[in-house]
């Protein structure tokens, strides 16, 4: 199958009376190929193989790649913790005041794991052509929250 025409796909999907599903799941694909979450979030080839395994096994109207809310934060300089079988998380606060915000530089596309996520997306789009491929990325407010460590303010704390 050649390149998918998204306008046609959207039109056909709207006109079709059948309910479609687009599961946003990647962990089962990681397990299917015998890899760890750490493998998938640090290696674009493994990431793609997990998505491909899901597409081969389960029907879905679209393929979704891993949306890792730490990729962009890492590219900006945040420290990331990588548990073997859990999603990565930001450790601590990168931004503490307005001066730190003003000093931020827009990261290059080769910073942190961005290149691996681009690789996973390119491989998925090139090889999974029977359905749309939906890439995930963090929004500006979520990114700001991770750089400023807003979890500090939203997590329960012990009472005195």
Report the location of each language-model feature.
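Glycine-rich, aromatic-flanked loop segments that form ligand/cofactor-binding clefts
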Residues: 16-25, 62-85, 112-151
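Short, structured secondary-structure boundary patches
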Residues: 84-89, 156
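N-terminal basic, low-complexity leaders that serve as flexible interaction/assembly modules and, when applicable
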Residues: 1-84
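Short, flexible micro-motifs
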Residues: 37, 142, 160
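A gly/proline- and charged-residue-enriched helix-loop-helix capping module
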Residues: 87-123
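Residue-level preference for long, well-ordered alpha-helices that form the structural scaffold
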Residues: 40-47, 106-113, 155
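Conserved small/polar residues in nucleotide/adenosyl-binding loops
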Residues: 153-160
